[in-house]
Structures are given as C-alpha cells and as structure tokens.
C-alpha cells in the first residue's frame, strides 16, 4: 500500500486489539537497547523513522528504559483487554503511565472473561446425560437460554453419583497404569511403588482433590504442605480419608517451579503420605481431561491478584467437579455459595509468608469442616445428597457464564465490529480519511503547547460558602491558535480524595462552547451543588475527534 509510516501505524492501530493474558513479569518481555540494536538496527531505516522513534514504540519515556513488547502492543492497538474483571483493574494499574492525565477508571482497558468450549471439555458421559434430559438442542441453545442447564434437575441424584463414581474409577484405573510405568522410571523404592498402587486400587472411592496446571511459583502448589502434621491428619483420617493428586510441568528455565514439583514428590515419599499424595508426570491434554472429570474437587491457590483468569476450573465445572479456589481471576466472578468453596479475595497480610500460612490454615479448615462432611454424608442409597446439590448449583449458576460463545459475542460486540468500522472509514476512497486524520493529529501536536488561557472566572469559595441548591460555575476564555472549538473538549472534574491524594473521578461535566470573543473561544460550565462538603476539582483539556480513540 506504500503508506508513510505514521499513516500505516494509525491504520494498524485502528484495526488491532491487544489481549493481555497475565500480570506476571515473565509474560511481559523487556529488552535492553543494545540487544534491540543487535537484531533490529536495520528496521528504522526501512520504516523511514529514527532509531529513537522506533525505540519509543516500546517505552514510556525516552530514557535508558528497556524496550517493552507489551508497551509496543498497547501503542499499536486501539483496544486493550484483560481476561477477567480483576485482571482489568490490575492491568490498568500496571500500564497507567502510558495514559498520562487520566485516572485508572477512565482507561480504555476493557475485559472479556475467558471461557471454555463445552463440547471439547465436557466428557462424553456428561454430554449424554444432558442430551438425555434436555434434548439434542442442548448444545445449540445453552448459551442464550440458561434454563437448559437446569435440565440436570431431571437426573436422579443416584444417576449423577453413579456417573461421577464411574469417572473416578476410570481416572484411578489410568493412574495405576501410568504410575506403574512412571514410578520405576524415577527410581522410586519398590515398597513405595507397591504401597501406592495398592492404595489406589483399593480406595478409589475416597475424597479426591486435584491440582494440575503449569507449575509457576505464583500458583502456590506448596501451600498445603506448610503444616505437614495437619495435612497428615487430613489425608489419614480413618473414617474420612482424603487424597491429593498433582500433575503439571514447569518451564525449563523456571528453577523455582521445578523445585515445587520436587517438593511434592519428596512429600509423597514420606511414610504418612504414601498413596495419599500423588504426583503424575507427563501432564498433557489427555491426563488433564481424566483429572478434570475424575477428581471430586479442583484446587487452585494463586497469589492474589496474579491469576488473570484461569480456565481449568471452568473445565472442572463442565464435568461435575467442584472448585475450591482463591477469589481471583474467573472464580471471583463465577463463585456462588453452595456451588464450590472460596478463599477471600483480599490479602490480609503484606508479608507473603504470613499470607501463605493464613491461606493454608483456611484450606485445612475448609476441607475438614465443609468439604469432608459434604462428601461423606450419605443417604440410605449411599448418595451424598448435599454434594449432588452443589454439583447442580455449579451447573445452574456457574457453567452458563463461561462458555466460548458468550466470550466470542463479547469480543465481537465490544471490539471487532468497531475495528471493522474504523478500518473501513480510514481505508475508503484510497485512504482519504486516514490522510485527513493524520493531518489533524499533526495540527494538534503543532498547536497544543501554544494554547493559552486568557481568562478564568469562577465562584470563589474562599470568600463565602456556596449554599446547597446554588450553582457552581466556571467561565473560560481560551486562545486555541489554529485549532477550532470542535477540536477540543474541556471537562470540569471533581476528584475522589483518599489519604491526601486524588485517586479517582467522582464526577465530571463537559464545558459548553458559548461563542467567540474576537479570535478567542468562550466556554462555560455550571453544576448545581446538591451535597455539602469539600470538593476537589480541576479542569482538563483534551483533543477530540470522531476517529480519536
């Protein structure tokens, strides 16, 4: 298309969305200027820009700051989205320096919570069960009509329990098969291998808690091992035993993640935990599906607020497996009482070690006081009625909100349609609107620092208080230089103050353009005072254009 760089950049930006998937630093690569020169020294010349202009695409300020790939993505995308509501707040805080002059709540960093594809992740037995009571149209309509999920109520509790028990037996059969090969390969002692396999063969019906995912340190796989004595009493309860099954992989360069796996295997070899703490190697999609449908509880213990979304718990819900997780990521939106268990959203301690100890204590107590009784309390048919009700609640109230069709529609309605309109507008008529828009932006840059406040008239609260019901007013006279009144928007902003600083906008009102005084532009803003108190306010001037975003 042979567009100049700034024009091409604008066209790319107006047709791009950047989805950020993690707040963890490892997910946001940064490179030194020397390293960038080694690989990209030829790029600026090809783009007809300077080296500093190229580097500025990945920096907040022109300093010795490293080149951030994430900053590059944000600067070259008109929309940015996180993958859960909490992740949106975290992302806004992370990248606020890229949006000078705006509060976090104003930043156009939106969110679309992740979701999963039910037909891919719901096991065949559950699919058949739903189709048997909801009809063949279940998968077609379960997104827009959540009542389809309530058809599970037509399944008898005994049928649900038999289905779930069958899935667990299938999991245990596969585990025995895999561990019989894996344990000798990792040089486990013969008596430990025999004891572990015997335990799995004879006790597949015990409460089974699964933890399987990437072993990053923020996932806190170590949490339940903080108090081994307490853990031993839980897993070895003579009447109500519990088994934990772990699986996952660490990144080859993540030494801390590898150490977590080593610790789990180390604990699993202790006499009191043989057969009760299991680590399964070679985690893959096949094993993930077995665990998701076969365990009773899906455990997730991330460090707050580093769980951008998480999807394994959604997949667990699709298979009648109950979640026990920190209220972070998707679970902060999905959790309903009676549909799983939760650790509170906020940290209690600034010290991560103390927070880990508290969370571990809460996990132990929740397992002992809530999860174990709900699982082991049975009726005359041997069915845990309370547990079955929780499975139903999870299907009723959680599963319908985390389906890929919902996610795709949100992306389409929030972003894709507007991106199409932007691109069409800018590219029509051989890019005429694009060239006009770039010319307008250059005019803004050329004149912005020259705008002059000629006069300001406003109510003087230092002389007298403004009675309730009266109007607070501000009148401005501006010299906009080459700019027109339509090129700018002026706002009267009232700030929310916490601990001596303005942290957010309480409310804002746009000034009205009321005419010209010679070559100067006149603006007015009036606001009725409906509440008493001390107000912190400011005036903000910013560019405006239909294509500015």
Residue spans for each PLM region:
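Catalytic cores of carbohydrate-active enzymes across secretory and cytosolic contexts
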Residues: 1-549
């Amino acid at each position: 298309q042979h567009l100049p760089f700034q024009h091409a950049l604008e066209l790319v930006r107006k047709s791009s969305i950047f989805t950020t998937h993690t707040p963890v630093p490892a997910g946001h690569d940064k490179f030194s200027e020397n390293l960038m020169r080694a690989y990209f020294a030829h790029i600026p010349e090809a783009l007809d820009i300077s080296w500093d202009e190229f580097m500025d695409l990945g920096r907040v300020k022109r300093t010795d700051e490293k080149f951030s790939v994430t900053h590059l993505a944000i600067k070259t995308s008109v929309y940015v989205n996180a993958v859960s509501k909490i992740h949106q707040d975290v992302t806004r805080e992370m990248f606020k320096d890229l949006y000078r002059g705006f509060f976090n709540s104003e930043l156009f960093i939106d969110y679309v919570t992740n979701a999963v594809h039910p037909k891919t992740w719901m096991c065949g037995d559950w699919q058949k069960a739903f189709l048997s009571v909801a009809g063949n149209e279940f998968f077609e309509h379960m997104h827009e009509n959540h009542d389809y999920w309530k058809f599970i109520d037509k399944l008898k509790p005994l049928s649900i329990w038999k289905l779930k028990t069958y899935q667990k037996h299938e999991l245990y059969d596969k585990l025995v098969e895999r561990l019989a090969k894996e344990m000798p390969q990792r040089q486990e002692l013969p008596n430990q291998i025999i004891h572990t396999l015997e335990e799995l063969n004879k006790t597949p019906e015990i409460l089974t808690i699964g933890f399987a995912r990437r072993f990053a340190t923020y996932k806190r796989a170590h949490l339940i091992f903080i108090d081994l004595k307490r853990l031993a009493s839980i897993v070895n309860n003579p009447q109500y035993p519990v088994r934990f099954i772990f699986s996952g992989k660490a990144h080859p360069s993540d030494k801390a993640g590898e150490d977590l796996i080593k610790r789990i295997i180390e604990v699993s070899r202790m006499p009191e935990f043989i057969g009760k703490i299991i680590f399964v190697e070679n985690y893959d999609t096949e094993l993930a599906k077995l665990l998701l449908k076969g365990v009773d509880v899906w455990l997730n213990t991330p460090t707050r607020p580093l769980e951008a979304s998480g999807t394994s718990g959604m997949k667990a819900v699709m298979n009648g497996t109950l979640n026990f997780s920190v209220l972070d990521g998707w679970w902060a939106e999905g959790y309903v009482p009676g549909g799983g268990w939760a650790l509170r959203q906020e940290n209690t301690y600034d010290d991560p070690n103390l927070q880990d100890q508290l969370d571990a204590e809460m996990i132990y107590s929740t397992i002992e006081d809530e999860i174990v009784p709900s699982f082991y309390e049975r009726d005359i048919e041997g069915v845990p009625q309370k547990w079955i009700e929780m499975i139903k609640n999870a299907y009723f109230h959680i599963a319908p909100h985390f389906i890929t069709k919902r996610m795709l529609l949100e992306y389409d309605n929030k972003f894709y349609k507007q991106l199409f309109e932007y691109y069409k507008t800018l590219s029509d008529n051989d890019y005429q609107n694009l060239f006009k828009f770039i010319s307008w932006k250059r005019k803004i840059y050329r004149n912005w620092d020259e705008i002059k406040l000629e006069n300001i008239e406003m109510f003087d609260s230092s002389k007298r208080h403004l009675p309730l019901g009266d109007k607070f007013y501000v009148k401005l006279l501006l010299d906009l230089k080459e700019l027109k009144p339509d090129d700018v928007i002026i706002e009267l902003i009232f700030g929310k103050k916490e601990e001596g600083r303005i942290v957010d906008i309480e409310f804002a009102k746009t000034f009205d353009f009321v005419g010209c005084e010679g070559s100067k532009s006149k603006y007015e803003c009036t606001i009725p005072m409906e509440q008493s108190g001390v107000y912190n306010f400011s005036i903000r001037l910013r560019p405006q254009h239909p294509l500015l975003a």
